[in-house]
């Protein structure tokens, strides 16, 4: 639960900075999970079990002290004044992109835009991550909260969504993944991305 995560970070000295909600399709969730709580047929039997779909959330936290490497921006003052809602300074983003990213609700996320669709070739037995993060979500987060050349840590590396996006956006990925099958797929996805970029090493 988000509340538990917030309290955990606060206990370690962080303060809650912001949250971003990302709409997820309840229909796609019902198809994927076979959850009767999301199915229309359940309203005909006993709608007391029915519930809305669950959104994704990005929680951001800050710690005390000065940010030694500011995240720079290319937004002039006139354009800045046109933005109605509070917004963080960001780097190398056009004004319309900034307005979209700073909306409280990201409605333009394609649920199929995941690392699974990125892979050019996969075998029948390749590991399938059950809940891969949409690449646009990761891209938006990197635009707001990191510079090119920064090192990005993924403590739950999964199949490499964040690591692949790091490479695509000129960041340096460090990933941690305990499940061996996910780790092998993570390496494969990084290798595929490096081939696309004609790189021979991460750095």
What are the roles of these predicted feature ranges?
Residues 187-203:
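S-adenosyl-L-methionine
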Residues 1-185:
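Core catalytic lobe of class I
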